[in-house]
Amino acid sequence: MNDIVDIVVGFDQREAVAYHSFTQSVIEKSSIPVRFLPLNINSLTNYKETHEDGSNEFIYSRFLVPYLMNFKGWAIYADGDMVCLEDIKKLWNLRDNKYAIQVVKHDYKTKIKNKYWGNKNENYPRKNWSSLILWNCEHKSHKILSPDFIQKQTGAFLHRFNWIKDSEIGEIYKEWNWLAMEYEEKQDINLIHYTIGTPCFEEYENSSLSFHWKKSFLSMLDGYFKKNKLD
């Protein structure tokens, strides 16, 4: 198993602060070395985004993770609009080589019709399964995940993991991908996903569980001479 945890994180310049707040939250809690790779569309030289239905810039590039890891070892993929409240080692320790991926298998109908930037928030099978993934990058089923292959596939095919068997999809408990504004507020959460909108956006500044995001954001500003004016 890897000595360093590789974490690939969705990055969209329009909410760059979300990426940095998330990585800050992981760094603060982690008891093992971590290595971040931002999924920045500008730096993916062998991949050209051809899909036109994405609500953010990493909605399809996340499926490049095994390719980016040279089809070796394991990696975590996480959307950028998250905050980690627990040691990432505990998630890392859930890896099971009999699976190609491991995800939280959400089963819900959304309560909210629209999300950030006015995007429609529609229901579809396996919604939000792909927002947090433990990737077994060397699993044989992933060998087809080349940049060219991903560019040609539909969102439904990719986000439902249709290139692998259902038996190859392991399950992680919901506390590792807790959906703010969709699930109730509670104390024992490991990772919050602000899937409707990150509290960096004005309309979600005081939304459910926003306190945790603001705390990570302010911690990320340590060393900034104007931080005291933002507290």
PLM region descriptions:
Residues N2-V5, F11, I32, F36-N40, ...:
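A glycosyltransferase accessory/donor-loop signature
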Residues E15-A16, C84:
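Alpha-helix N-cap/loop-to-helix initiation residues
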Residues S25-P33:
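Short, acidic, metal-binding catalytic loop of nucleotide-sugar glycosyltransferases
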Residues R35-L68:
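Active-site-proximal specificity loops/subdomain of glycosyltransferases
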Residues N42-Y47, K109-K111, N177-M181:
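A short acidic, often aromatic-flanked loop/helix-cap motif at beta-alpha or helix-coil junctions
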Residues S61-K111, L134, S141:
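GT-A fold catalytic core of metal-dependent nucleotide-sugar glycosyltransferases
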Residues L94-L158:
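Conserved catalytic core of nucleotide-sugar-dependent glycosyltransferases
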